[in-house]
């Protein structure tokens, strides 16, 4: 039987110290380390696999401490903020110093006389993580349907992929001030974006274009280099290794859903001039989330496996899974797979790489996995959430 952790104490927590940094709070076990979880309670899938839109008003951005006791994460607070599953599970981020959280609300919810429909939103929430409880301090207007986002290691620049605007918003970060300073036109729908460790380049996933765009970054000036890399079908998500040598893309294969066919993770050599795809690794069916360990030795691709499809579909599975990828130099190899729960979305490693957290949308919980070298095992511990986890992200490393 799984060890389930109750979702209690949702609004109030006493984890913050005089330092004012959410990631440096001392405790008897360790230091608090925050993870943001976007809870979307407006969307459900029925047994027939059909999506249903429910009335809004119950979404939250839930803040989870994964540092004090990594084996038993705890909810610190839940802020009543609308957010959406309609985008990759990376529409939020935490600054490297742990002081700010940014959350993009991809879709607004509009009454159409017969129910509710999704319409592109333009909001990025700014959350102060240094106060107890954390609180939203600002909302920044960006492009339409802001989705995957990234913050550079310097903590002074953020990029937001605007799917409905075919653009990327550039945000400056100074202390607790976040401002829109530029918009980069891409010309095609972009789902996610990631900085290289040195902050001089970024990659953007051109979801329906089956490509990755290369961006150049000079200070606060971001330009589209007009160079694209052909990856697998429907690249929804991507990440870059801590040493900057490789990038990995989650090639979903079916426009964000499952179809029963195996799909790939594309491997990009970032040291090559110009960068290029050097391999495609078969990982399983419908990878959506992807994350690289802070150690740089391991990555995971989160597989949907038809877990939100009709139960009568031949490729339906009750649970999704996590493909384990070993990184050895520039060779990436699938070395295992761990079953989790229904419609897994986000994946977050602990800062030391010893723990892995997977958000299970259909089951409203988070699976806690233990990492031992190249092996990942399910501990059986589940953190109950106040709703369905559409996205998850830890502190920028």
Predicted regions and their residues:
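Bacterial N-terminal signal peptides
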Residues: 9-19
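Predominantly soluble domains enriched in secretory-pathway, periplasmic, or organellar proteins
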Residues: 21-397
């Amino acid at each position: 039987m799984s060890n389930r952790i109750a979702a209690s104490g949702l609004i109030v927590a006493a984890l913050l110290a005089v330092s004012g940094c959410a990631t440096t709070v001392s405790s008897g076990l360790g230091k608090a380390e925050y993870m943001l979880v976007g809870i979307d309670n407006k969307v459900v899938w029925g047994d027939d696999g059909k999506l249903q839109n429910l009335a809004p008003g119950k979404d939250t951005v839930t803040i989870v401490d994964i540092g004090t006791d990594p084996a038993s994460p705890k909810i610190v607070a839940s802020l009543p903020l609308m957010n959406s599953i309609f985008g990759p599970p990376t529409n939020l981020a935490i600054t490297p110093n742990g002081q700010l959280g940014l959350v993009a609300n991809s879709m607004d919810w509009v009454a159409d006389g017969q129910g509710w429909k999704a319409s592109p939103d333009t909001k990025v929430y700014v959350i102060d993580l240094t106060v107890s409880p954390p609180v939203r301090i600002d909302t920044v207007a960006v492009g339409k349907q802001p989705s995957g986002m990234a913050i550079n290691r310097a903590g002074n620049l953020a990029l937001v992929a605007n799917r409905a605007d075919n653009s990327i918003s550039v945000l400056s970060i100074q202390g607790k001030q976040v401002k829109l300073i530029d918009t980069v036109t891409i010309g095609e729908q972009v789902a996610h974006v990631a900085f290289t460790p040195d902050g001089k380049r970024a990659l953007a996933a051109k979801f329906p274009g089956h490509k990755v765009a290369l961006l150049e970054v000079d200070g606060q000036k971001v330009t589209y280099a007009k160079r694209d890399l052909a990856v697998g079908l429907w690249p929804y998500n991507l990440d870059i290794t801590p040493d900057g040598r490789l990038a990995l893309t989650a090639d979903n294969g079916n426009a964000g859903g499952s179809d029963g066919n195996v799909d790939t993770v594309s491997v990009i050599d970032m040291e090559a001039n110009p960068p290029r795809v050097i391999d495609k690794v078969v990982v399983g069916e419908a990878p959506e989330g992807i994350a690289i360990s802070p150690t740089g030795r391991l990555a995971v691709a989160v597989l949907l496996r038809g877990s939100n499809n009709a139960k009568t579909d031949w490729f339906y599975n009750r649970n999704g899974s996590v493909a384990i990828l070993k990184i050895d130099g520039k060779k990436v190899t699938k070395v295992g797979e761990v079953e989790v729960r229904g419609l897994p979305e986000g994946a977050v490693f602990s800062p030391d790489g010893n723990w892995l957290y997977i958000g299970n949308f259909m089951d409203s919980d988070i699976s806690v996995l233990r990492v031992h070298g190249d092996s990942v095992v399910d501990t059986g511990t589940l953190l109950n959430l106040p709703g369905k986890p559409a996205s998850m992200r830890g502190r920028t490393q």
